[in-house]
């Protein structure tokens, strides 16, 4: 496999640095959409409460709130580079970001608990709703990370 990509030509004039924000935003949107698509599919396929407890949607809602909280704070506000201090300043931005990450990790851990505690350990015939809850939260979590850290704020330099 040493010469696998040697025949393909990548354009040298293609500047991926200028398109970084676009690519990261599209990738994060696709991940977020895929997460909600999976859980909607599970809710439609298993509408009865004994097959899929619909209170499990709470994890996805909390993951979505965490997604919004994480991305509401810019990296400049966390570093203290912004021109205005805002409502609580740099410390408030860091606390807000920390709470957002706590909610994101908490919803991901809760979705694993739902998968294993509610479907695998009970040896249910249908495990797909538990897998759907986990993948929904995983996709939303990774979409939030891509949207937060995949973009850059220094377009003018």
UniProtKB/Swiss-Prot annotation:
This is Transmembrane protein 50A. The keyword Protease does not apply. The chain crosses the membrane at residues 26-46, 58-78, 95-115, 126-146. It comes from Mus musculus. It is found in: Membrane. One of its GO terms (cellular component) is membrane. Pfam families: UPF0220. Keywords: Acetylation, Membrane, Phosphoprotein, Transmembrane, Transmembrane helix. Its main location: membrane.
